[in-house]
């Protein structure tokens, strides 16, 4: 009994909730929704306000239960909005672009995974994720899958959510911290009051919300990166295993899972060669000596210079 020791009322409520949660998980699997397991950093601070240790956030059953219940609430709200308004607030997630899927397929092959980016395989991505469960580099591979996806956005027309495999989806559960949720609550209230409230300039408002969401996400990541950079100064000169998470004509972005961070390996630090940037294969190809560095490749790097204020780590090969 998972809830032994609780008072009767709480025990019954939690037992019923857990039973419903299990049924929702089965429906999630039946739909083919994506379940990405990506390590999220938790910064453990000391009394002086500096990062003492970086660990991975634990995802408990309680977190999953609440998440599934919130998804159901969001879907119910979206269904009601679609029935009552020609335009409303929807959280859409488009089908992934073919070029990104092609890159994902190539990156997986380099890690011994034969997966072709066909339409059937894209719709059955959960089967691929299931194959990755027992691999030690699971989190890295899941991040590759995430990077191949489109960004979700707020839009007035309902287009569905690819990742969650819902025909209609919106954000309803957090009106105190997300403006789109507040709009959804106002629209739902107008349905209850039988006085439908049509919002002017809705498309512009939702586009603004999507932009600000990206800005807030970027700012949050930058703050975390700056704090992690301070923590990483103690590792300057040390060697770490990483993987190439981005390729540009000027160098490589390398993720270092052990440190929960990303650094830049400038092209000048690579083995001597004349490198060409191949946008399609996302690689730096050496014309003279045949060196090649491709998105998804494993790579050993040294921590070089660190700029805490800029949140940047320079790497050496």
Feature locations, PLM:
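Electropositive polyanion-binding surfaces
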Residues: 1-277, 296-316
């Amino acid at each position: 009994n998972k809830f032994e020791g609780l008072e009767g009322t709480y025990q019954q409520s939690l037992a019923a909730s857990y039973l419903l949660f299990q049924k929702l998980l089965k429906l999630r699997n039946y739909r083919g929704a994506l379940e990405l397991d990506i390590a999220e950093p938790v910064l453990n601070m000391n009394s002086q306000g500096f990062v003492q240790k970086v660990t991975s956030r634990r995802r408990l059953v309680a977190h999953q239960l609440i998440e599934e219940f919130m998804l159901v609430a969001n879907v119910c709200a979206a269904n009601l909005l679609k029935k009552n308004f020609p335009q409303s607030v929807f959280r859409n997630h488009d089908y992934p672009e073919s070029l990104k899927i092609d890159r994902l397929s190539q990156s997986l092959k380099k890690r011994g995974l034969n997966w072709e980016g066909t339409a059937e395989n894209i719709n059955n991505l959960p089967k691929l994720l299931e194959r990755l469960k027992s691999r030690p580099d699971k989190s890295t591979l899941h991040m590759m899958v995430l990077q191949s996806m489109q960004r979700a956005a707020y839009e007035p027309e309902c287009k569905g959510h690819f990742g969650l495999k819902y025909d209609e989806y919106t954000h309803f559960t957090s009106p105190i911290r997300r403006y789109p949720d507040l709009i959804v609550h106002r629209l739902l209230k107008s349905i209850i009051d039988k006085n439908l409230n049509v919002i002017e300039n809705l498309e512009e408002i939702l586009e603004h919300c999507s932009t600000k969401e990206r800005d807030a996400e970027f700012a949050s990541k930058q703050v975390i990166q700056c704090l992690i950079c301070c923590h990483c100064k103690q590792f300057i000169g040390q060697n770490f295993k990483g993987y190439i998470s981005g390729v540009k004509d000027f160098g490589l972005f390398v993720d270092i899972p052990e440190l929960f961070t990303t650094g830049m390996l400038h092209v000048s630090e690579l083995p001597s060669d004349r490198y060409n940037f191949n946008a399609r294969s996302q690689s730096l190809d050496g014309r003279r000596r045949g060196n090649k560095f491709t998105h998804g490749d494993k790579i050993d790097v040294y921590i070089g210079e660190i700029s805490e204020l800029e949140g940047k780590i320079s790497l050496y090969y």
